[in-house]
């Protein structure tokens, strides 16, 4: 962990611009913006910033509190490692097909919410896609190590894995705080939801503590708590998928969340074709409707889930779902066309 004083977010998919983050002024005096970065959560860099003129002691306490929450959920959501005295998603996956396992109430609440989102998104946000996602993940990793041997999954591999993605295999006993995966070949993967959910929990803790004028950036998931002292927001850039050194659109945001999913970040190439990491549950292949999709809504967990679910939906279906949930969305199509909801248009910065 290190203390930082300016925004250095050059690898994020959604990036607060330096021009939008100059030190605000309070009626009394100029205040120093404060920030800390953390490198241990969700395999990415996380940032906590304050523009509220907090004392150093108050900022240290609040940033430590937010960091602690991110760390707690990082451990709960980890599908690769178990931790002493704690049953997490890795524990559940390794015991698939076995007996029910007692878990922390926080993990119960999360999994219940995940199942609700499955219904809300008509199955496009499915945390039981682990059997399929792991195949693509392993092949993408192998291609990075040896590009000459890169391949895509066979139809047989995907069809077999696709038989083990039934959300009903995730059995939750809320009263007794236990979870069971009934299918021994099924597994949980919360890559489309976990980071946003953890970010939202950290933001709610900050809000309950009276924080205002804070910004969380957890690997590109932006959650803003309040506004700058003068009541203004932050200018946030959405990368141009065709040239990621530039911005396709700039947004002015305050007291909300912003999450982008894109086909240009995690991918590998086979025979000149790019295969990215956002897998459509209907085809078991990377979704090809859009190059980039940005969601703005206050709840970071919902923003995270929708950025994946809508990426896997035709435009008309996605627009209808976004409207029903009060989410603002910006779609960038493979040919460069940009569409957005009426509310998103109001957020576009001049």
Which stretches of residues belong to each language-model region?
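Mature catalytic core of soluble alpha/beta enzymes
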Residues: 2-10, 14-350
């Amino acid at each position: 962990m290190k203390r930082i004083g300016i925004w250095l977010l050059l690898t994020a998919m959604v990036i607060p611009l330096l021009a939008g983050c100059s030190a605000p002024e309070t009626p009394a005096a100029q205040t120093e913006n404060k920030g800390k970065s953390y490198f241990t959560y969700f395999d990415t860099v996380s940032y906590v910033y304050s523009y509220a003129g907090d004392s150093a002691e108050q900022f240290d306490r609040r940033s430590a509190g937010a960091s602690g929450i991110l760390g707690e959920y990082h451990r709960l959501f980890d599908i690769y490692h178990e931790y002493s005295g704690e049953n997490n998603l890795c524990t559940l996956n390794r015991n698939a097909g076995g007996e029910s396992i007692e878990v922390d109430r926080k993990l119960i609440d999360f999994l219940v919410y995940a199942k609700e989102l499955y219904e809300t998104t008509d199955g496009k946000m499915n945390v039981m896609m682990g059997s399929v996602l792991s195949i693509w993940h392993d092949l993408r990793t192998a291609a990075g190590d040896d590009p000459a041997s890169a391949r895509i999954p066979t139809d047989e591999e995907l069809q077999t894995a696709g038989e083990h993605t039934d959300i009903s295999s995730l059995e939750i006993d809320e009263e007794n705080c236990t979870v069971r995966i009934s299918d021994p070949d099924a597994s949980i993967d919360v890559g489309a939801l976990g980071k946003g959910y953890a970010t939202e929990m950290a933001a709610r803790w900050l809000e309950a503590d009276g924080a205002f004028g804070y910004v969380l950036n957890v690997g590109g998931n932006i959650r803003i708590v309040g506004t700058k002292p003068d009541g203004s927001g932050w200018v946030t850039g959405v990368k141009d998928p065709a040239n990621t050194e530039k911005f396709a659109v700039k947004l002015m945001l305050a007291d909300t969340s912003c999450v982008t999913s894109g086909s240009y970040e995690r991918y590998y190439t086979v025979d000149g074709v790019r295969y990215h990491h956002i897998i459509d549950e209907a085809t078991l292949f990377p979704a090809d409707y859009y190059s980039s999709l940005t969601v703005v809504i206050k709840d970071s967990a919902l923003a995270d889930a929708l950025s994946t679910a809508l990426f896997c939906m035709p435009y008309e279906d996605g627009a209808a779902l976004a409207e029903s949930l009060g989410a603002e969305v910006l779609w960038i199509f493979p040919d460069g066309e940009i569409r957005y909801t009426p509310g998103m248009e109001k957020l576009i910065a001049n």
